[in-house]
From Swiss-Prot:
Catalytic activity: homogentisate + O2 = 4-maleylacetoacetate + H(+)
EC number annotated for this UniProt entry: 1.13.11.5
Positions of Fe cation binding: H349, E355, H385
InterPro entries: HgmA_C, HgmA_N, Homogentis_dOase, Homogentis_dOase_bac, RmlC-like_jellyroll, RmlC_Cupin_sf
Record keyword Metal-binding present: yes
Keyword Oxidoreductase in annotation: yes
One of the protein's GO biological processes: tyrosine catabolic process
GO molecular function list: homogentisate 1,2-dioxygenase activity; iron ion binding
PANTHER family: HOMOGENTISATE 1,2-DIOXYGENASE
Pfam name, any one: HgmA_C
Species the sequence originates in: Sinorhizobium medicae (strain WSM419)
Oligomeric form and interacting partners: Hexamer; dimer of trimers.
Requisite cofactors: Fe cation
Name of the molecule in the record: Homogentisate 1,2-dioxygenase
Length: 453
């Protein structure tokens, strides 16, 4: 799909350099789109080559420990003070921010939705975002929000940055380009893209689809990082070399543009006369990236039992409590099931964490019916969940030969905070009223006598 989209896309003359990438996670990168535009040996020369301005973008306090200290130096056509102006407030009524506890009539329970309907009008990426849940408090930089999006139009002269958190974008249908201040990222389903807090970007479509649809985790807290592997060792899971950060690219155009900002849950816009994506060169470790979920190397039980789903963690955003995430991004990818004498699907569970799930393609092994690509489910803290009746029967009675679980890619945003449902999610027409019935066939088998029932 992406190859076709690349052939169809024609770069405008004012857009320098197409998408290219540097491998690694958390590296101190350096890249320039014009030769000699990146200063050597210092960060802030008295005068920069090409008449550029030097500017630092900090993603952490100056005094953060070296391992978590993040900043990038940008060399740009105009400083960022020229990329904003007199702001006026605007509204994106479907994008909500924690704390958000609206009144709605939907009772507590396990919930599942079919995909968002395709837009009936022209919507850009920003206009197509719909908040499903919020958790924590963006003002104190803890928690997250789970969004779904569906759009069908490009952000041509519109640009955006989010001061409230970083955005982890998970496409389900349709490839698109995220053009950030630091470069271009082409992303397609089965890939993810992360845009750091405060970084300007716009989204344009690639390919030919009726709708571009997917999911977003807005992380208010500490940034996503790779989980510790512990006794797994130095390899497997998400390997650092498979993360791709874009090379420098800039957009040099003089035309009326709009910069939109999300700040403490409110939205603001300013009119400017040029593109703000004007970084010609940069170096540092505060940068966007993408990752191909197909490169995740899963580990699992190779004799018996089903391990905890934490073994499928791609990225984790830590909290102040050791071993407890502000939010985890977990996937359930293709893998071999080989455990003996074992109920192989995920087991029945009640959990202190709250789980928002989506399906990128294929089927999810614990629920083969009703949970479709583009769909969503929510199992809040301490609400029981697990395989549906048909999944239980199939796994309980099937032959335990090695089976490859293929054509599947589900994911989960899991947070330590309860996820508060938005009114939009509670009243969404695709809410499956009969979801709770998927467990109704699980009847009592116990009769007080020993033996397998």
């Amino acid at each position: 799909m992406l190859e076709k989209a690349e052939r169809q896309r024609k770069a405008a003359p004012d857009q320098q350099r197409s998408a290219g990438y540097m491998p690694g996670f958390g590296n101190d990168f350096e890249t320039e789109s014009l030769p000699g535009s990146l200063p050597q040996g210092q960060n802030s020369p008295q005068k920069c080559n090409y008449g550029l301005y030097a500017e630092q973008l900090s993603g952490s306090p100056f005094t953060a420990p070296r391992g978590t200290n993040e900043r990038s130096w940008l060399y740009r056509i105009r400083p960022s003070v020229r990329h904003t102006g007199r702001f006026t407030k605007i509204d994106y009524p479907h994008w909500k921010t924690a704390p958000h506890t609206p009144e709605h009539s939907l009772a507590l329970g396990q919930l599942r939705w079919s995909p968002l309907p395709a837009p009936s009008q022209s919507l850009t990426f920003l206009q197509g975002i719909r908040t499903m849940t919020t958790a924590g408090d963006a003002l104190t930089q803890v928690g997250m929000a789970a969004h779904a999006y569906a759009f069908n139009a490009d952000m041509v002269d519109d640009y955006f940055f989010n001061a409230d958190g970083e955005l982890l974008i998970v496409p389900e249908t349709g490839a698109f380009q995220v053009f950030t201040e630091l470069g271009r990222i082409d992303v397609e389903p089965s890939e993810i893209c992360l845009v750091p807090r405060g970084m300007m970007f716009k989204v344009t479509r690639l390919g030919d689809e009726k709708v571009w649809r997917g999911y977003i985790c807005e992380n208010y807290g500490a940034k996503f990082t790779l989980p510790d592997r512990g006794p797994i060792g130095a390899n497997c899971l998400a390997n650092p070399r498979d993360f791709k950060t874009p090379v420098a690219a800039y957009e040099d155009k003089e035309t009326p543009c709009r910069v939109q900002v999300k700040w403490c849950g409110s939205f603001h816009t300013a009119e400017i006369a040029h593109s703000p994506l004007d970084v010609v060169a940069w170096h540092g470790n505060y940068a966007p990236y993408k990752y191909d979920l197909k490169t995740f190397s899963p580990v699992g039980a190779i004799l018996f039992d089903h391990p905890d789903p934490s073994i499928f963690t791609v990225l984790t955003a830590p909290s102040g409590e050791e071993g407890t995430a502000n939010v985890d991004f977990v996937i359930f990818p293709p893998r071999w099931l080989v455990a003996e004498h074992t109920f192989r699907p995920p087991w029945y569970h009640r959990n202190i964490m709250s789980e928002f799930m989506g399906l990128i393609h294929g089927r999810y092994d614990a629920k083969e019916e009703g949970f479709v690509p583009g769909g969503m489910s929510l199992h809040n803290m301490m609400l029981a969940h697990g395989p549906d009746f048909s999944g239980f029967e199939k796994a309980s009675n099937g032959e335990l030969k090695p089976v490859k679980l293929d054509n599947t890619m589900a994911f989960m945003f899991e947070t330590r905070f309860p996820q508060q449902l938005t009114t939009f999610a509670a009243e969404l027409e695709t809410l499956q009223d009969d979801y709770i019935d998927c467990w109704s066939g699980l009847e009592r088998k116990f009769d007080g006598t020993p033996g397998i029932k």
